[in-house]
Amino acid sequence: MQLVILPPDRDTITLVLLSNMPPDDREQWQLALDPDWPLRWRNYQLSRGPTGAITWRLSAAIREHYRVRINRLITGRGGRPGPGDRPYQYPPETARTQVLLLAQHLQRYPGLGGVRRDVYALAQHSTRVWQSTHPGQPYPHWPTMPYLPYRQPQTASLSELDGVLK
């Protein structure tokens, strides 16, 4: 996916997203930086970072999905236990392995600043849940999320973009 920023027109700046993947029901196109209804693309949403910089982060639905998965991996399979039974809980080594596999899976997301912050927040959530349910057991250490290398932005005149945008 590529982002094209067109020159300002009075009070607006037009952002054009180009993708080599056809759109499906996961895309919703609207005002890009609306905090209540952000631009979403696949598992990402466009947002502003703490310094006001525009960045991609994991969408709210995906962040909640991973929080629920972490809770289930650490605390058990879910569901109601039978009368007098304790809820099923994975043995600590199995739970640790499953959490680390999930952490490894999250490494496939790009290392953008917003995505890195979201994965770090998930790692902190995992540590808190682990320490509350497995006291005395060492918590799983998540791998460090790789940085996405910054590339020099490419510029083009509007006449060159005219054929691309039609």
Q: Predicted regions: what is each one?
A:
Residues M1-R26, N43:
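Catalytic palm active-site di-aspartate
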Residues L18-L39, G49:
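Helical (often loop-to-helix) elements that flank the catalytic cores of nucleotide-handling enzymes
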